[in-house]
Design a protein with these regions (language model features):
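N-terminal hydrophobic/helix-forming segments and targeting peptides
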Residues: 1-432
Length: 432
């Protein structure tokens, strides 16, 4: 099971590739890809289908034995994006006549220092000319070799570096791409790389490239480590590990009375306020359309919402042995201790006593341990998907996730055992 997760992480350096890989696995398992611009048609028990939005979010559905008005929805949601650096337009910056850097901007909230002095690569999507102005073609790109590096300043020029350094997002974190050896290469290095990669798939001319969404990614493969290989080291565990756990559960679960939903949103790391984010009404539209297809009435959707339950799956903070003072004294999850239910008195999480009891019961039924997380009262925490989604669809639900160390680092640390626990709990949820 863990090797499949590692393969998925290695093949999914950015949101676009993660969604494509999820879509491919859904298709291989018999789910039909539907165009959301077309009618759903008649739906019957066992029908399995999915739709995508913006190439970076994906929504999978399996219709249950009972109409949604009678049995509701069981929904697992997660997000496809992770903190990184986005490559700006006109990105090449020439220094001293030959050294080429790329101009980037920060996406989300990365621990920027963790991106230094490690091999990086480029991944994302390229938009090329299509049949007409409103129908450009999307091509995905993943340069599968080390291509760039952000280098530290030597300690001899910065004697205070180990006392903490404030980094400039515009100056200090620009990656080195290469050296130009020919006058014709100046201003063309990045585009030449893009063309080389795209032409592995099909012939693309430079004039056909209209734009791109390209990002930096760690070029070092995900791996396990520890005396018993009990830990996972990888970028993007937050939140691709939860995406993959939800996918594994969806593909292995039995058909049940309840309609099963897997929703992988984008842009959680920047607030979710996009057409492909959790704040979008897109999922609500799809659920309402399922109700209309079954009954011809919106009333089915409103009844289903009252019977539904949502698991918002986004990683939690594991207790760090070097910084115990940062954690709540009685509610600090441990690596390998099982899925973590998140609570916050300021309502940053959807969990309450009633919904937490439901999830804890699911874990118990699946034979999985369960933990609880509350922030240290003097340390501000983050927010996640649950309440954002619940503000547009008033779902009963819980915010949870597997515990990880170094959240938002270029490489995070998780637990092999926790991934196995999470898949069991999610599968139990879908089976009920």
């Amino acid at each position: 099971m863990i090797n499949q997760l590692l393969d998925f992480l290695n093949a999914s350096p950015v949101n676009f590739l993660a969604v494509r890989n999820i879509a491919d696995k859904l298709s291989d398992s018999g789910f039909r890809r539907l165009d959301p611009a077309m009618p759903l048609g008649t739906l019957k028990a066992g029908d399995s289908f999915f739709v995508t939005k913006n190439d970076s979010s994906v929504y999978a559905f399996r219709i249950g034995h009972k109409p949604i008005a009678d049995a509701g929805f069981h929904i697992i949601c997660a997000h496809s994006d992770s903190p990184t650096f986005r490559i700006k337009p006109n990105a090449e910056m020439l220094a001293e006549g030959s050294m080429v850097k790329l101009n980037t901007e920060v996406y989300g909230g990365p621990i920027m220092s963790t991106w230094f002095d490690r091999p990086l690569t480029i991944a994302g999507r390229v938009i090329v000319r299509g049949a007409d102005a409103f129908s450009p073609e999307t091509m995905l790109l993943h340069v599968q070799r080390p291509l760039l590096q952000i280098s530290n300043l030597a300690i001899h020029f910065n004697r205070q570096v180990n006392d903490g350094v404030k980094l400039s997002r515009q100056k200090d974190v620009l990656p080195l791409l290469g050296q130009v050896t020919d006058e014709l290469e100046k201003g063309n290095l990045l585009m030449n790389i893009i063309l080389e990669e795209l032409n592995k798939e099909r012939e693309v001319k430079r004039d056909d490239i209209l734009d791109f969404d390209l990002y930096l990614a760690d070029a070092t493969p995900a791996c396990t480590f520890g005396v018993h290989n009990e830990f996972i080291s990888s970028g993007r565990l937050d939140d691709l590990s939860m995406c993959y756990a939800g996918l594994e559960a969806m593909l292995s679960a039995d058909l049940s009375d309840t309609t099963q939903v897997l929703a992988i949103f984008d842009n959680e790391e920047t607030g979710s306020q996009t057409k492909q984010g959790a704040a979008s009404p897109f999922l609500a539209f799809m659920l309402k359309r399922i109700g209309m297809a079954q009954s011809g009435s919106e009333e089915a959707f409103y009844q289903a919402v009252e019977r539904a339950f949502m698991i918002s799956a986004d990683n939690a903070h594991a207790w760090h042995p070097n910084y115990p003072e940062k954690y709540d004294p009685t509610n600090h999850p441990m690596l390998g201790g099982g899925p973590v239910i998140k609570f916050n008195a300021a309502q940053k999480y959807a969990s309450d006593a009633a919904s937490a009891a439901v999830f804890a019961s699911l874990c118990e039924k699946a034979g999985v341990p369960c933990q609880r997380f509350v922030n240290h009262s003097d340390v501000a925490g983050g927010s996640t998907l649950g309440n954002i989604l619940a503000s547009s669809i008033p779902l009963r639900g819980v915010d949870m996730g597997n515990a990880i160390l170094a959240m938002h680092s270029c490489r995070e640390t998780g637990s092999v055992r926790d991934h196995e626990y999470c898949v069991k709990a999610f599968t139990e949820f879908f089976n009920l």
